Regions:
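Shared catalytic-loop signature of beta/alpha-barrel
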Residues: 57, 210, 216, 227-244, ...
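Metal- or metallocofactor-binding catalytic centers and their adjacent structured scaffolds
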Residues: 38-113
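C-terminal extensions of enzymes
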Residues: 336-378
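Conserved, mostly hydrophobic/aromatic
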Residues: 4, 35, 42, 63, ...
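Glycine- and other small-residue-rich loops at beta-strand/loop junctions that grip anionic moieties
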Residues: 48, 99, 167-171, 197-198, ...
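Structured beta-strand/loop patches that form or line metal/cofactor-binding pockets in enzymes
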Residues: 1-46, 50, 335-340
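Metal-dependent enolase-superfamily TIM-barrel catalytic cores that perform enediolate-based chemistry
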Residues: 123-239
Length: 378
């Protein structure tokens, strides 16, 4: 039996050429954190934490003493030990995102020690590839928003993506004008999702949903603040577009509350934010028990991409309709050198389809030169 002998964090930092924003966050830099867990036998596992990198790193650094000497195969025991230790002030938010990075790294080790991809250890690979949609269409500084976004989504269409997610939540009238122009540009067959990043109140969200429905929208993501499940329910019941959310709900209890409130039609756990693979599996099972679709949120480096692909491979076919709806993969197309640079072999789409790695663990190798190149310097 091998035991955990070391835990390290790697904060990556990159200044963007052009700043961009969603309705809730402005970006002039990309920062992400990787978690490296090493065993006595030399096996190394990699994870990633969703959210503010320096804060996640500080929490992981506080947690690491509870990992040293533990069996890396005991993922459930480690998860519960960390959660119970910090639960009084850490039931959601960055405490859970920090645990997520650790958990993903431990599952990577587990897969390597057992010579199996993580998806097999989660119960099996229901698919070997997954269609991808492009996430982008943020509002950028110094350009005309509508013409800029239309040109962007046409690039994605030409690359073979089957769908695009548009960022809204700024001004309802302008947002609707954007949706109209994008639909006119891409034609009737390309899927369009809209994401308000909780930029509206419920009254605005209902109005936008009703008006946008004529443009054949797949889902309306984060229409209102994540704390307001009653407002989610109001938006879901008073406009026709399926409602999605979940990237800001952490651990099983937050997801349980949203599912039981019938707040969403589509739940979007992020494997690097919800609590890692250990918690992701629980959320998928509970969502499917309640007839809620699962479409994971993805935002990060190549490690996050690899983890999400393993998670998606193991999502069972939803039994709530005759022809199961397949999950789709969110592929961030904004400026992000870490998406590929941290991996020795890149994970890239081919005409809008992602192949799921089948090597042990996450199925990736880390490029340590890139970790040094993009190392955060406070």
């Amino acid at each position: 039996m091998t035991l955990v002998s070391g835990v390290r964090t790697h904060i990556l930092d990159h200044k963007l050429k052009t700043a961009f924003e969603s309705a809730s966050t402005s970006f002039n830099r990309r920062q992400h954190i990787l978690v490296e867990v090493e065993c006595e036998c030399g096996t190394v596992g990699w994870g990633e934490c969703l959210g503010p990198a320096p804060i996640n790193a500080a929490i992981v650094d506080q947690m690491k003493n509870r990992l040293i000497g533990k069996n890396p195969l005991d993922t459930e025991m480690v998860w519960l030990d960390l959660y119970h230790t910090y639960r009084d002030q850490g039931q959601r938010g960055v405490t859970v995102t920090a645990i997520s990075g650790i958990d993903v790294a431990l599952w990577d080790i587990k897969g390597k020690l057992l010579s199996q991809p993580i998806s097999v250890l989660l119960g099996g690979r229901f698919r070997e590839s997954v269609p991808a949609y492009a996430t982008g269409a943020f509002r950028r500084e110094g350009v005309d928003r509508i013409s800029d976004v239309v040109a962007e989504v046409l690039r994605y269409k030409n690359e073979g993506f089957h769908g695009i997610k548009l960022k809204i939540g700024f001004n309802a009238d302008e947002d609707l004008e954007l949706i109209k122009h994008v639909r006119d540009a891409v034609g009737p067959d390309m899927r369009i999702m809209i994401d308000a990043n909780h930029g509206y109140d419920s009254t605005e969200a209902v109005a936008v949903g009703r008006a946008a429905n004529s443009y054949n929208i797949d889902w309306f993501e984060e229409p209102v603040l994540p704390e307001l499940l009653d407002s989610y329910n109001e938006v879901r019941s008073r406009q026709p577009i399926p409602v999605a959310g979940g990237e800001t709900w952490h651990a099983r209890w937050a997801m349980k509350a949203a599912i039981e409130a019938r707040a969403v039609d589509i739940i979007q756990p992020d494997v690097c934010g919800v609590g890692g693979f250990s918690e992701f599996k629980r959320v998928v099972d509970y969502a499917q028990m309640n007839g809620v679709r699962v479409v994971p949120h993805v935002w990060g480096t190549g490690v996050q991409i690899a983890a999400s692909l393993q998670a998606i491979a193991a999502i069972p076919f939803a039994p709530c309709r005759r022809e199961p709806l397949e999950p789709i993969f969110e592929f961030d197309r904004t400026e992000n050198p870490f998406r590929q640079a941290v991996l020795k072999k890149h994970l890239e789409h081919r005409r809008g389809t992602m192949k799921i790695p089948d090597l042990p663990g996450l199925g990736i190798e880390i490029c340590r030169e890139s970790l040094e190149r993009f190392k955060y310097k406070p």
